[in-house]
Swiss-Prot record:
InterPro entries in UniProt: Anion-transp_ATPase-like_dom, ATPase_ArsA/GET3, ATPase_ArsA/GET3_euk, P-loop_NTPase
Disulfide bonds: none
Residues the record marks as active site: 61
Gene name of this polypeptide: GET3
UniProt xrefs under CDD domains: ArsA
E.C. no: 3.6.-.-
Broad class of where this protein is predominantly found: cytoplasm
Cellular localisation: Cytoplasm; Endoplasmic reticulum
Keyword NAD belongs to the record: no
NCBIfam families named among the record's database cross-references: GET3_arsA_TRC40
Organism from which the protein derives: Phaeosphaeria nodorum (strain SN15 / ATCC MYA-4574 / FGSC 10173)
Keyword match Cytoplasm: yes
Subunit structure: Homodimer.
Protein name: ATPase GET3
Class of the enzyme per the UniProt entry, highest EC level: hydrolase
């Protein structure tokens, strides 16, 4: 089916412009679930490690895949990837992050708030019920750790689109959370003081005012880094999709949202493309290529000013340093 055929020359665009942009400090890789975000972010991180002194790859997806991609266990602390001396990776647990913030370190957040009895349980339930708070606290933990580290460029392997958009709304969520805490403090101040006992402290030494102060300090860090996120010289977002309707729909939605957040995006990676083989005719393959061609043309028409990178469907899994590097 000649009209559906895609030739190798169509695959020329690459992510080389991102590698060449030496000012970049933050790179986000995101898209619909199952389109190859982790593979793309891992491959990009490996290539960046050839051009930069130090690179950090962070997974903010609750269903972490970095460990599977590199055949190496990662956790909430940055760890060098086997075979590299300048490429590290870490996986953030958003639920753990909010508990650490509530506790201020040491004991768990649940133990800290338990000292307030029923009032503590209500405040903890409130914190967890604020829309997007898990993504926000994950973001806060990332920034806190990044602030104390020294990496030339940081790549975020993000969660599927909906989570990622909430993840990028952190400043707004933080404002709402602080507003709720302040409102509760004013409304239930006398009642809280009667629960707290001498010195206005919880049994474990934690103080509600100290909690609020820590959240305010964290907001200051967020404000600083958020300014960098809106700087196209420092930050870009790589959209990953496949040539299908739902993926294209989510990509458009994400790009519109990124524009509203003032976050630069000019690269789209289209994965799982089928290419014709002359000696292996396949009716299903031809039908799928025809469908892919239709959506690929729509992508090129919609995003004619974008760098559209086309990647073929591979015959085997992309796992391990060698395959990711290719």
């Amino acid at each position: 089916m000649a009209s559906a055929a895609l030739i190798d020359s169509d695959m020329e665009p690459t992510l080389q412009p991102i590698l060449d942009q030496k000012t970049l400090r933050w790179i986000f890789v995101g898209g619909k679930g199952g389109v190859g975000k982790t593979t793309t972010s891992c491959s990009l991180a490996i290539q960046l490690a050839k051009h930069r002194k130090s690179v950090l790859l962070i997974s903010t997806d609750p269903a972490h895949n970095l460990s599977d991609a590199f055949n190496q266990k990662f956790g909430k602390d940055a760890r060098l990837i086997n075979g590299f001396d300048n490429l590290s990776a870490m996986e953030i647990d958003p639920n753990g992050s909010i508990q650490d913030l509530l506790a201020g370190g040491g004991e768990s957040g649940e133990d800290a708030m338990a000292g307030l009895g029923g009032m503590g349980n209500m405040m903890q339930d409130l914190a967890f019920s604020i829309p997007g708070v898990d993504e926000a606290m994950s973001f806060a933990e990332v920034l806190k750790q990044v602030k104390s580290m020294s990496y030339e460029v940081i790549i975020f392997d993000t969660a599927p689109t909906g989570h990622t958009l909430r993840f990028l709304q952190f400043p707004t969520v933080m404002e709402k959370a602080l507003s709720k805490v302040s409102q509760l403090s004013r409304q239930f101040g006398p009642m809280l003081n009667s629960f707290l006992g001498g010195g206005g402290r919880l049994p474990n030494g934690q103080n509600i005012d100290e909690l609020v102060e820590k959240m305010e300090a964290l907001r200051g860090t967020i404000s600083e880094v958020n300014g960098q996120f809106k700087d196209a010289d420092l930050t870009t977002f790589v959209c990953v999709c496949i040539p299908e309707f739902l993926s294209l729909y989510e990509t458009e939605r994400m790009i519109q949202e990124l524009n509203s957040y003032e976050i630069d995006t000019h690269s789209i990676v289209v994965n799982q493309l089928l290419f014709p083989k002359q000696d292996n005719p396949c009716e299903q393959c031809n039908a799928r290529r025809k469908m892919q061609k239709k959506y690929l043309e729509q992508i090129e028409e919609l995003y004619d000013e974008f760098n559209v990178v086309k990647m073929p469907l591979l015959v085997e899994e992309v796992r391990g340093k060698e395959k990711l590097e290719k």
